[in-house]
Amino acid sequence: MKYYSTNKQAPVASLQEAVVKGLAADKGLFMPMSIKPLPQEFYDTIDTLSFQEIAYRVADAFFGEDIPADTLKQIVYDTLSFDVPLVKVADNIYSLELFHGPTLAFKDVGGRFMARLLGYFIKKEGQKNVNVLVATSGDTGSAVANGFLGVDGIHVYVLYPKGKVSEIQEKQFTTLGQNITALEVDGTFDDCQALVKAAFMDKELNEHLSLTSANSINVARFLPQAFYYFYAYAQLKRAGKADNAVICVPSGNFGNITAGLFGKKMGLPVKRFIAANNRNDIFYQYLQTGKYNPRPSIATIANAMDVGDPSNFARVLDLYNGSHAAISAEISGTTYTDEQIRETVKETWKEHHYLLDPHGACGYRALDRKSTRLN
């Protein structure tokens, strides 16, 4: 399959070019030329399939034309060496637990898949010394560093904001050594992301160092995140709760929810999505006004969502042909303060004995009918 740029000013690229380059020549984000709907029989029997079997069917729709079936299957099965259980929290509210991977971050799925896919392409081409740049507010750095650790021909550079990453996550990517280098930046996540983007915009530097990105701007990082939306639906179906499913995604850089929207375009029976923001409510404001106004990020206790200019908004716009009406018809938005997040963590523990992290609390609060009326 070919990939085009969201800016529409660059030549189409192969999957290999899109993965290795990360960003298109016109600085746009790569998008697949087509999104293949999966057949109805897949959805009819999805509740009988394992996570790996479901993920392989989804991966084949995206990558099957470019990667041999046995290789793709091995990449999928190696990536998904852990479960992603759907756990009931309250009546009709479930939590898809994405923290069972090696670094306890939801990005373990995308990070591990990309590491294996990029490793395959590099080995295939006999390429050496590819440099992966990644900006992180915590979880991306951990997941990508762990996924790429020890992969031949690849060196990873993690840029993270000083004093704005949890101690355990900082240790997860600063103590590995080998082919992982961590760089502390005196600034915010947005500053780190700007540095990564600036490196890609420097054509000479890009070519000399063979740069690619492991942030969700890379198609190999964000597309595999679609796997677990299908698995969540399978688990809902097993529980007899698959009708009129609403999925709320705590959202920062918008790679995760974009992967879910791709799933919906492939026929995944989801009624609508909710993007839950903290005080960095750029998308929420876009839904209200129709205007996208990025601004410097604000530090919150849901720090992985502290993004003032979400990169993947360009993909959301492209997916819906720039139509605010079409986006609003399928995606709702919410925004919460630190005080509201703390309140939700406390109340959910008290009422349901389920411990939410601050990001999950944003998602739960949006789904809780006491807090939000769903359309």
Which sequence ranges carry the predicted segments?
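PLP-dependent amino-acid enzyme catalytic core
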Residues: 1-373
